[in-house]
Amino acid sequence: MEQEICVISFSGGQDSTTLAVWAKKRFKKVCLVGFDYAQKHSVELECAQKIASLLQLPYEIISLDFLENITRSALFKNSNDLMGHSHAQNKDLPNSFVPNRNAIFITLLHSYAQKIGASNIALGVSQADFSGYPDCKEDFIKSIEHALNLGSNTAIKILTPLMFLNKAQEFQMAKDLGVLDLVIKETHTCYQGERRILHAYGYGCGECPACQLRKKGYEEFQAKALFQ
């Protein structure tokens, strides 16, 4: 793998930052790609840019601001949907879910990988702590990998090394990679865009579903460390 190129879907969050460091140790070249899809807070993109610079990795942003016009999610900047409720289009999903977001991201990453000659795409998705998003599950990833390769006569691999790791295990992975401090202080997870309050697990409001999941994971990580 050391001679191969890997394209990473990069949001500047805990998952994709840990993934980027993992990939940097394994591939000759790593390219980070972020998406501006009219999410509520630009802080996500700002953190991604800073982390990319700290990791000395190339970073590009693809604009997808049209998504807000064709579907609904509490993550959109103009949305009035209240966080923590069911999705307006599907009561079985959280309203932070953006329908087909990962399918669109992966399709564009696949095109980009073909352009630069990359044989690998890496995603920070996990079905252990997946927030109720069906497009983070392994069966979806395998299906879209097969479909895109079939439709473009390619054999690009979609790697998901975090697929079966929970947040506590991801904190441990960051520690093992030597970037725990970076993950805590520089990555962004909070749905509310809060960057004024630094908790033990990182910046955030401490109340939104993303903060709660990250907080729980960090507490489990710390508890396990006490017995090692």
Curated annotation (Swiss-Prot):
Its cofactor is Zn(2+). GO terms for biological process: queuosine biosynthetic process. The keyword Transferase does not apply. The keyword Nucleotide-binding applies. Keywords: ATP-binding, Ligase, Metal-binding, Nucleotide-binding, Queuosine biosynthesis, Zinc. Pathway: Purine metabolism; 7-cyano-7-deazaguanine biosynthesis. InterPro entries: QueC (IPR018317), Rossmann-like_a/b/a_fold (IPR014729). One of its GO terms (molecular function) is ligase activity, forming carbon-nitrogen bonds. It catalyses: 7-carboxy-7-deazaguanine + NH4(+) + ATP = 7-cyano-7-deazaguanine + ADP + phosphate + H2O + H(+). Binds 1 zinc ion per subunit. Its EC number is 6.3.4.20. Disulfide bonds: none annotated. It is an enzyme of class 6 (ligase). ATP binds at residues 10-20. Zn(2+) binds at residues 190, 205, 208, 211. Belongs to the QueC family. Catalyzes the ATP-dependent conversion of 7-carboxy-7-deazaguanine (CDG) to 7-cyano-7-deazaguanine (preQ(0)). PANTHER family: 7-CYANO-7-DEAZAGUANINE SYNTHASE. This is 7-cyano-7-deazaguanine synthase. It comes from Helicobacter pylori (strain P12).
